[in-house]
Structure formats: C-alpha cells, structure tokens
C-alpha cells in the first residue's frame, strides 16, 4: 500500500480531532478517528499523525480562538514545536496576570529550545526582533498584554469578591460544598535536610516528589479518592507488586515535573462531576493556572459540567479562606510523615538504609491510609469553620487541638531519629517551602518543557529492587481465616469487623470456584 500523501492540516482541523476524541463519552480508537476525520473533512490521516495531535504537546489547540485556528501548519514558523510550546507558556502566564514582554518571549524561547529533543543538535537561533514580530503575528492571541502591563488586585475588589462568594456558598448545604487543592509531597524527606533534587535536560526537579490532589466536603463526611501525580507512567514498584491503583482506591497520573497540568486538571474536573451525578454541588478552587485553563477548556467544549458549580477564591486569599490550604493539607502531611518516621526508625534498627528500601508504592499506601483512615471528619469540619467562608461566621484563630496533638507526636519521633542533638523546626519537615512554591516564570517554562522529557520506569533511581511474592486467591482466603481465628480468640472482638471478613471470604471463595 503506497504511503499517504502529506496533506496540510489547519489548526482548526487538529483542534476538531482533539475535541471529538476527548469529549466523546466512549473514547474512539485511532482508526475510528481516522475514519471520522475523512468523513467530515475529506482528508486522509496517518495513525502517527493522530497520535501526535492527541499528545500533550498539542494541548494549546484546546484554547485556540477561531481566527488563529485557520492557520495551516505549513504557514507556521521555521520551528513549529517551539512555537506551540511558547503559546502554551503564554497562555499559562497570562492566567497569572503576568507581564508578557518581548524580552520575556525571547528569553523563554531560548530556554525551551534547549529542552526540545528535535532541536538538540541545532544551534540556538538568534531570536531577533524580526523573529519576535513574525511570531506575534502568527501565533499570539489577541488581547495579549505587552510591555509590562499586568493587573493587580484592589483590596476593595478583593473584599467585594469574598462577600459574593460567601453569598453563593450560603445557597448550598454544607455537605454539598467541596474544596479541592493539590500539594507537593517529598515522600523521602529527611528531618533537617532539604529535598534531594536532580537536573534533567535543563529542568531542576525534586528526586522523590509527587503532587497529591485532595478534595472533601465541608462536613468531612465525604473525602474523594486521592489523585497522585508522579514521574513514571507505571512505576517499577507498582509493577513488581502487581499493584493496581483503582483497586487501591486512588488515581495515578504522571508527567515530567510530577505537577498538576491543565490536561490532568480537566480530567479531574470531569471525573469529579461524574462522581457528583444526581447532585448539585459547589466546588471551591484557588486561582491556579491549571485550574483556570482546565475550566476554560470545559466551558468552551460541548461537554460541560452538569452537577458542579465552580467558584475561584480571590488571588492571594488562600492563606485566609482556603480550608485545604490551611490545616487539612498540614494534617494530611503530618499523618504521612508519622508513617515515614516510624519506617525510618525501624529500618535503621534492622541495619538497613531507609532511603534505599523505601519506594513510591509504600508512600502511596501511607497516603491512602492517612486520608481514608486517620482523618476524622471533625478535623475537616473545623477547618471549614476556621476558614471564614461561611456568612456570619468569624474565622477561628490558632491551630486545632488535633493538629497540635499530631505535631507533638511527630516532634517526639523526630527526637528519636535525631537523638535530640539538633535544634529542629518541625514546620520545615511537615510542610517545607519546597513543596508549596508559587509558579514563577521559570516554573511555567519547566512545566511546558516537561512534555519533552523521556518516560521513566521508576520514581527515583535510589530504590533497591524488591522481590514481591504474588498472592493467589487461596493465599488471601488463608489470611482471612487467620484474621477470623484472631477475632474468635479476642475477648473484645469487633462483630462488625468479623461480618466484613465473612463477606470478603464469600467473595474470594466464589472466585476460586470459577
């Protein structure tokens, strides 16, 4: 079969392919996409072209306006991959009211150039003023802020916005008010040390870091499953243990910086909206670039949110009004650090190096337990009360007793680890500044450039290979029998626990029969 003759595609046609794929209730196969495109646009496509269009490097198409979308690829500049990345950078920076000057564009172009594999053996272009003017005409959106223009938040406007948000919140029952936030978590952080970092193709990133997305309602009665974003598509520790994230009650995503991106946030919002099926809920978010871009993509699509109303907190208000940004994230990290400290102490007692034996699967297990088991609804409810989001409710001051208790417990464990020989600020261990840095222009460049990093097989290169015995159904049944025997021999056995074990035993026995 002769190869397909290359046909120039407009950005609008590429955008249509992405829209049809990502907004379809049932994701079409690439062959189905090719047939659909030929039927609607009378052009033939190669499968490799479809794969490229659906990849993250073409995310910028989702926000492209109608006028610019008629530009054909062969009318782009000499370096289309770079220009697509620059459009992505520009969109993210504008969301933060950042000043996009000509010098900023040229500087970011040079930074991105060094990180794009296709250009690795080519000299860096001059990026002259002539190139800049042509690039602006070709690609930049109308309404671009140039020459240092940026918007600032007026205090009066800020207070008016909060009054309007409080009025909106008052229309919802507390059980239908949700807050979502993400936080970095350096899962091998050692007391009195900074997170270990590495430099990969010009990008500096923490070695053992994930981003954890947490979401809960105001009463604490509902905690959504965690979303964890790492570096590897399928970490080696997961494969060795044959661990399946869905079975563990969490969702795993990945990218080159282990941070929230527009595409992951858009996926999360649609997942959350499906989770709220049959309800009308309010979702409170902070004004983070990925949040805003994702919501804008959804609002401009045919498949909009049905069950969820989204409201953004004013800029620079998260320290005051953000429940998850206050004690909820702090408590979550405190619970996690407790498991990690206990693990370190035990490994050292056994003569092992915890930094080598630790892996991301163990970390995720502790995250899930911290969130699903250790977290009491009262902690979350009190955090919402302390936030001042509710009308006629003065924000409470000072940490809650539970948060203080967790910190005291951690301080005792740290004393055992350090041997009380060092002065130690516990805040630097529970919630280090490196995990919560704001997005600077360098951060945004890193996030855009991350799409060009090679896929990883592991989360850190320090992990020792760990042999895992794959359990059979018979092994699981035997383990349940052991637990049932333990319950029978306990004077204070838990009847509800016994019933749960019997139900699980029945399910496993039905599997073994099949």
UniProtKB/Swiss-Prot annotation:
One of its GO terms (molecular function) is DNA binding. Transmembrane segments: none annotated. Residues 172-384 form the DDE-1 domain. The keyword Transcription does not apply. GO terms for cellular component: chromosome, centromeric region; nucleus. Residues 70-145 form the HTH CENPB-type domain. PANTHER family: PROTEIN PDC2, TRANSPOSON. Binds to the central core and core-associated repeat regions of centromeric heterochromatin. This is CENP-B homolog protein 2. It comes from Schizosaccharomyces pombe (strain 972 / ATCC 24843). The gene is cbh2.
């Amino acid at each position: 079969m002769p190869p397909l003759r290359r046909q120039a595609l407009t950005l609008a046609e590429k955008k249509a392919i992405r829209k049809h794929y990502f907004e379809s209730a049932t994701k079409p196969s690439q062959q189905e996409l090719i047939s659909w495109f030929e039927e609607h646009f009378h052009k033939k496509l190669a499968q490799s072209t479809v794969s490229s269009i659906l990849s993250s490097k073409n995310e910028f198409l989702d926000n492209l306006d109608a006028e610019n979308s008629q530009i054909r690829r062969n009318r782009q500049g000499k370096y289309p991959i770079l220009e697509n990345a620059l459009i992505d950078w520009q969109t993210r920076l504008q969301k933060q009211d950042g000043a996009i000057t000509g010098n900023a564009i040229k500087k970011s172009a040079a930074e991105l150039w060094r990180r794009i594999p296709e250009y690795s053996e080519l000299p860096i272009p001059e990026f002259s003023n002539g190139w800049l003017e042509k690039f602006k005409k070709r690609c930049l959106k109308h309404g671009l802020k140039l020459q240092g223009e940026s918007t600032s938040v007026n205090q009066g406007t800020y207070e008016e916005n909060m009054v309007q948000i409080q009025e909106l919140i008052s229309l919802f029952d507390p059980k239908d008010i949700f807050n979502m936030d993400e936080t970095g978590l350096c899962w091998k952080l050692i007391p009195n040390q900074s997170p270990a970092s590495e430099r990969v193709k010009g990008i500096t990133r923490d070695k053992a870091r994930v981003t954890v997305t947490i979401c809960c309602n105001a009463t604490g009665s509902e905690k959504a499953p965690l979303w964890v974003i790492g570096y590897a598509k399928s970490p080696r520790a997961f494969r060795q243990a044959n661990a399946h994230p869905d079975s563990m009650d969490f969702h795993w995503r990945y990218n080159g910086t282990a941070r929230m991106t527009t595409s992951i946030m858009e996926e999360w919002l649609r997942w959350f909206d499906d989770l709220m099926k049959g309800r009308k809920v309010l979702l409170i978010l902070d004004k983070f670039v990925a949040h805003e871009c994702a919501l804008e993509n959804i609002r401009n699509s045919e498949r909009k949110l049905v069950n969820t109303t989204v409201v953004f907190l004013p800029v620079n208000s998260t320290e005051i009004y953000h429940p998850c940004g206050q004690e909820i994230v702090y408590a979550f990290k405190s619970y996690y650090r407790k498991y990690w400290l206990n693990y370190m102490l035990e490994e050292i007692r056994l003569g092992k190096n915890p930094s080598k034996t630790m892996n991301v699967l163990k970390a995720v297990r502790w995250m899930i337990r911290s969130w699903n088991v250790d977290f009491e609804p009262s902690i979350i409810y009190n955090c919402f009360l302390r936030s001042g989001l509710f009308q006629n409710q003065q924000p409470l001051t000072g940490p809650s007793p539970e948060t203080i208790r967790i910190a005291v417990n951690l301080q005792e464990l740290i004393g055992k680890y350090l041997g009380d020989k060092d002065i130690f600020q516990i805040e630097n261990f529970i919630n280090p500044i490196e995990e919560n840095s704001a997005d600077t222009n360098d951060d945004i460049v890193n996030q855009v450039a991350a799409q060009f990093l090679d896929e990883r097989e592991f989360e850190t290169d320090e992990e020792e290979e760990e042999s895992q015995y794959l359990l059979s159904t018979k092994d699981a049944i035997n383990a349940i029998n052991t637990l049932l025997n333990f319950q029978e021999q306990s004077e204070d056995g838990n009847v509800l626990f016994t019933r749960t074990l019997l139900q699980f035993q029945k399910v496993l026995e039905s599997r073994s029969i099949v």
